[in-house]
Curated annotation (Swiss-Prot):
One of its GO terms (cellular component) is cytosol. A zinc finger (C2H2-type) spans 404-426, 432-454, 461-483, 490-512, 518-540, 546-568, 574-596, 602-624, 630-652. Induction: By retinoic acid. The gene is ZBTB16. This is Zinc finger and BTB domain-containing protein 16.
Amino acid sequence: MDLTKMGMIQLQNPSHPTGLLCKANQMRLAGTLCDVVIMVDSQEFHAHRTVLACTSKMFEILFHRNSQHYTLDFLSPKTFQQILEYAYTATLQAKAEDLDDLLYAAEILEIEYLEEQCLKMLETIQASDDNDTEATMADGGAEEEEDRKARYLKNIFISKHSSEESGYASVAGQSLPGPMVDQSPSVSTSFGLSAMSPTKAAVDSLMTIGQSLLQGTLQPPAGPEEPTLAGGGRHPGVAEVKTEMMQVDEVPSQDSPGAAESSISGGMGDKVEERGKEGPGTPTRSSVITSARELHYGREESAEQVPPPAEAGQAPTGRPEHPAPPPEKHLGIYSVLPNHKADAVLSMPSSVTSGLHVQPALAVSMDFSTYGGLLPQGFIQRELFSKLGELAVGMKSESRTIGEQCSVCGVELPDNEAVEQHRKLHSGMKTYGCELCGKRFLDSLRLRMHLLAHSAGAKAFVCDQCGAQFSKEDALETHRQTHTGTDMAVFCLLCGKRFQAQSALQQHMEVHAGVRSYICSECNRTFPSHTALKRHLRSHTGDHPYECEFCGSCFRDESTLKSHKRIHTGEKPYECNGCGKKFSLKHQLETHYRVHTGEKPFECKLCHQRSRDYSAMIKHLRTHNGASPYQCTICTEYCPSLSSMQKHMKGHKPEEIPPDWRIEKTYLYLCYV
């Protein structure tokens, strides 16, 4: 046999990836060839930088420093242990309450697939908890009728935003016989919304509620074309509407194969099969954060109300017998097929609208196909939801009179100003960007926690009182002197700010806690700190008459206030001609241009490393044992700001200061612009 005439021969070992990971994990557990040490809360984890860099984009960036020790302060040792298991075994075991921490860690470390899995699991858990809560409410039967109406209409009102994104499920000329498959299964279901047409879900729910008001109970929808979930038989007073709307999160039952077959009717079988393989759509960031928050809140509030789960095969009193749900939630992804109807003609009987006091504009038959595409997409939905919104707001004001409530997640806040600040979290507007890697975050706290990953470095010595890190032991001993004697300093563990007195730290902590105990004598507005109140008082003196309604800062002229407010509103009028990136302030755009030109006008005097902007240079100086940007040329003491250096120089005697001394000589950096 002539081997030279044979083509290329391919040899493949299908078990190689699994065996490679398994061997790497064994070496990690044995401490063999580990070349990096990750410290989390004084606990060391030995690992291989290649494995971590392949798993996490953030580790890949950090490991370019060729350091052996890194410190992570934004997660717990338990969470990082789970991250390690995931990196070395491609699996991890976690409880439901750990998903929130895993999601946050995966986002910062940029482990994309783990982040997606946590998002989907949080959505699934939230949907399951919503069904459990509704069933508990049906068993108790002690809830007020007005509260129940407000809750359902609130869900309808919340779906307004999702409806504008999903669009019509059925438009003119596409009224197919039989069920249709909605094309937007990624619409958030964290509030009990289905993947069906949002308008139909709203009208069906409203009609059911109206019938309950007229007849005293909710009747299940009649007709052979309305599919219901397996495991029905819930109390018809509350659970029926929820059951119908949550079909998108349920796996089709083996007892009802017709439901699965109907999902591929109408000539759309291939698309449905592909979507079934992909699993449910990835939810939006705002919905999953809300889901995680509601997951914790809901368990705390209903801990005393939820009865213990029934054993398998035993049905609770008053319900048909059906298998009990699994006791724990696992990191599995459901492959579900949305199979809801979306009829073209939606009608609302006048009897229902009269019972609910709905305006006459809703008590008509609405045939979308008659408009022939003349109206803008989403116009009818917006008009309908504006009416439902007025009704929901009216009912909410009657049932809740204490404080203000977020219309998205339902959390109660002390005043309207706090609600407006809170709503920014739901908008998903990430206005805080990292200057080192470009990643953006919802608030400054998450950005500061992310920056710790950049500034970790090789710092093995940690202060046990404030958490400050140093690369040399003598630097740590020098730092510890600040915690002793009359000059003892205290630090905020949340933001790292330093204070000379415990009372000042306590006042500062009230800002993090959201306590507002300082009241303006002129306008009775409340503020979280004395400093914020003093800043606000400038608006009454006339020196700084222009006040920011978001944070209370005052300015001398309107143009400065306008520039400042862009930080809160997210407006970015300055756009880069090269890459299209937008900025709130003009000087930010000018600094950004240096990315394209390669200009680095700031130079470190200690190691001659150059940076594009001042803030990056300040961050770099901290890598030199935490050096502040200004150093006295007489006593070599460091100062954190130019004003503090000026105050420090006043403490020196005039004869100690050289005749050619200038303040610029205290700078630890050079600026060539």
